[in-house]
């Protein structure tokens, strides 16, 4: 379409999907273009918005080499949420470095608001979204409403991934009033991050 995005928005767990989404636009951003990259986290696993930048193992058992990342610590036990891919304790090194250098911003949304946004999108577009995509759509709607209020004509780029099965659990849980937001497990968070005292 020969048009550069003003916003690139995507959900983030470990960072592979989000990193791939923003990668083509990173050089221009580093060279001065004001493209805003927004990573959307699950509120119960806020690796960027509440984590620390340190070296940590990529796996929970600590068998893999330690790499620099934003992390909640491999010992952090996140609550069970339907978007399982967003429960990882850390963020990929390259994405973490870009966040550290303030090329990326991050927000955290809960299940109910994200799934409600996803349901709205599904009803409007006819696409049954994956749980991860619902978080993206939630933030996209927030930014679109901001544009409407300010009269901005910002171009927003985002990706949505369709549900890979006929599992209707997210929608059933939302419509039946059974879905609830999970918060970060404070005790587990404090214990896990406590391992890094003196290292950050």
Q: Which residues make up each language-model segment?
A:
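Glycine-rich ThDP/TPP pyrophosphate-binding loop and its adjacent helix/strand module
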Residues: 1-34
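Short glycine/serine/threonine-rich phosphate/pyrophosphate-binding segments
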Residues: 11-22, 47-48, 132-140, 166-168
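Short beta-strand segments
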Residues: 10-13, 39-41, 157-161
């Amino acid at each position: 379409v020969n048009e550069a995005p003003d916003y690139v928005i995507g959900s983030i767990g470990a960072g592979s999907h989000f990193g791939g989404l923003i990668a083509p636009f990173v050089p221009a951003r580093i060279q001065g273009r004001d493209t805003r990259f927004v990573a959307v986290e699950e509120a119960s696993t806020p690796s960027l918005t509440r984590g620390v930048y340190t070296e940590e193992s990529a796996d929970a058992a600590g068998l893999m080499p330690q790499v620099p990342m934003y992390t909640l610590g491999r010992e952090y036990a996140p609550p069970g949420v339907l978007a399982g891919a967003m429960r990882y304790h850390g963020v990929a090194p390259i994405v973490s470095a870009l966040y550290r250098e303030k090329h990326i911003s991050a927000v955290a949304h809960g299940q109910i608001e994200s799934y409600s946004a996803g349901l709205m999108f599904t009803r409007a577009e006819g696409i049954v979204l994956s749980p991860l995509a619902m978080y993206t759509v939630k933030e996209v709607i927030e930014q679109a409403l901001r544009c409407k209020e300010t009269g901005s004509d910002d171009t927003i780029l985002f990706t949505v991934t369709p549900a890979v099965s006929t599992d209707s659990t997210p929608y059933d849980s939302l419509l039946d009033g059974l879905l609830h937001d999970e918060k970060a497990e404070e005790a587990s968070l404090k214990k896990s991050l406590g391992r890094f005292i003196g290292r950050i």
